[in-house]
Amino acid sequence: MIEKIENYIRNPAVVDDFMSNCFYGTKSQRDRSEGAPRITWTWEPHTTSDLFPQFSHVLLQRHYKRPENGLFSDSPFWAFFKKIIKDFLKDNGIEHKRITRANINCTYHFNHAHCGDPHVDYPQNHYTAILYLNDVPGSTYIFDKQVDYRNLEEDSSKFIIPYQTIDWKNDPIPVKYEIKPEKGKMVLFEGSHYHAVCPTAPGHLRCIVVYNITY
C-alpha cells in the first residue's frame, strides 16, 4: 500500500494540448487540430452535497452506475486519459487491480466554505489519483482521518462528513497533506483518507481528472 505519491505525468505537455484543443478551443489550436472534440459537460447540482455543485464529464462510469452490458464509457477522451494513468502507475511502480472510475471535474469559486465536504470515493481498498489540468488556486486537502470500509458497508452515509457538521474553529479535522494544483501534476493517495476540494479564486475554473483504482 502506498500512502502518497506526488509527481508529474510522463509528458505534461499533453495536458496543454488537451486544454487548448478541447477546453479553451483557442484559434491557434483549432487551426492546428481542426476537428478536435470539445468537452461536453453535465451540471451536477448535488455532489457530496448541494453546497458544492460542479460541472462534470464522465470518462469511466462508477461501478454501480454501469450497465449490465454495453460500454462503460462513451467519452471520446477516455483512451487519452486512460493511457496517462496507466503510464503513471507503471512509471511509479504502483501495483493495482483495476480502474473503477474516472471523471473530469470543473469547479468554480465558492465563498461559503473554506473547503468541500470531506469524503471518500469508493467502499473498498483503493487509491484516489488526481491529475491537475490547469494552474489555478484551489488546493486538495487530504485529511488525517481515514474510513473503516466495514463501516461503509453498514452505513453508506459515512462516505461523507458534511461540512456544516464539523466545528472547524474548535475541533477541525487536521489536514495531513495540502496539494496545490500544477498543470500536468498527478497526486495519488490511499483512498481511505477523507479528502476535499478547496475553492478556486473568483473568475477561475479549476479542472481536474479524478481516478479511483483498486488494489
Residue ranges and their predicted role:
Residues 73, 78-82, 86, 91-215:
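Catalytic core of non-heme Fe(II) oxygenases with the double-stranded beta-helix
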